[in-house]
Design a protein with these regions (language model features):
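A charged, well-structured terminal subsegment
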Residues: 147-155, 275-276, 280-285
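Anion-binding alpha/beta catalytic cores of soluble intermediary-metabolism enzymes, centered on
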Residues: 93-154
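Positively charged, low-complexity intrinsically disordered leader regions
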Residues: 1-27
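Short, well-structured alpha-helical segments in soluble
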Residues: 75-87
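Short beta-strand segments enriched in small/hydrophobic residues
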Residues: 31-39
């Protein structure tokens, strides 16, 4: 089975649009997401454009602030602090990567926890690992939604995650644990990686290396979730971290690239923005 993130995200965005349509009468306004883009990296520009289009579909107000890559770290942090204090703003996202002279860690930590729609703030990360209410990172959240929509049984399964980044690898491992999978995190220093991956019933790959996972690394019937977005060095076309053509016949479930995890990441960003909005509404009522 091929899981189309494009189709699933379209259904979920339609449901969110119906939900948001009732907000002006109920709450007086719709959620407001502010996206900050520093520089003109083509990939970042494309991602930001996709987020703006999704916001329009769902009915969320989207403001994109574009700044040159010459902006100083202090100027960017000051801008974020102003948005933190702006009651009309429910979600703040700074598109990564940032220029080398700006600390991504400082930027992420400066965004107010309650407006951190990416789920990267240290307090949100801590809450995730403590099983407390928090904003879940978009890509891991989307991965779990995709598997559940495809009817994948996660409980009790052997899950292998290749990649240990704070953005995907570590949080998706935690979400799989929360679904009662038995999780192994593999990485560049893992000894005999093919032996590890062949033992997986669920394989999540997020390492950013085109077609890294080959057919001999996957057992028959494995659920394969490909998070990578790369350029095929031979064709120049988009491809994932797994050799899709070779692995698709062996996999029980697989996600394509493009059209797999990517659309679900943006879909979950919309969901997180709505959640941040509703939490802020709830807090304002109880204050």
């Amino acid at each position: 089975m091929i899981i189309s993130g494009k189709e699933l995200s379209a259904r979920l965005k339609a449901e969110m649009a119906a939900q948001v349509a009732a907000f002006p009468e109920k709450y007086g306004r719709v959620p407001h997401l502010v996206v900050i883009l520093v520089g003109e990296d083509p990939g970042s520009v494309s991602y930001v454009t996709g987020k703006a289009k999704a916001s329009e579909v769902v009915g969320i107000k989207n403001t994109t602030i574009r700044k040159p890559d010459s902006i100083t770290e202090d100027e960017l942090l000051c801008m974020i602090r102003e948005l933190n204090e702006d009651d009309s703003v429910d979600g703040i996202l700074v598109q990564l990567p940032l220029p080398k002279h700006i600390s991504e860690d400082k930027v992420i930590a400066t965004i107010a926890k309650e407006k951190d729609v990416d789920g990267f703030h240290p307090l949100n990360v801590a809450a995730l690992w403590q099983k407390q209410e928090c904003v879940l990172p978009c890509t891991p959240k989307g991965i779990i939604k995709m598997m559940k929509a495809a009817g994948v049984e996660i409980k009790g399964k052997r899950a292998v995650v290749i990649g240990r980044s704070n953005i995907v690898g570590l949080p998706v491992s935690k979400l799989l644990l929360d679904e009662n999978a038995t999780v192994t995190i593999a990485h560049s220093r893992t000894v005999n990686l093919p032996e590890v991956t062949r033992n997986a019933e669920i394989l999540v790959v997020a390492i950013g290396r085109p077609k890294f996972v080959t057919a001999d690394m996957v057992s028959e019937g494995t659920v394969v979730i490909d998070v990578g977005v790369n350029r095929d060095p031979e064709t120049g076309k988009l491809c994932g971290d797994v050799d899709y053509a070779a692995i698709e016949p062996k996999a029980s479930v697989i996600t394509p690239v493009p059209g797999g995890v990517g659309p679900m990441t943006i879909c979950c960003l919309m969901e997180n923005t709505i959640e941040c909005f509703l939490r802020r509404i709830r807090w304002s009522v109880t204050d």
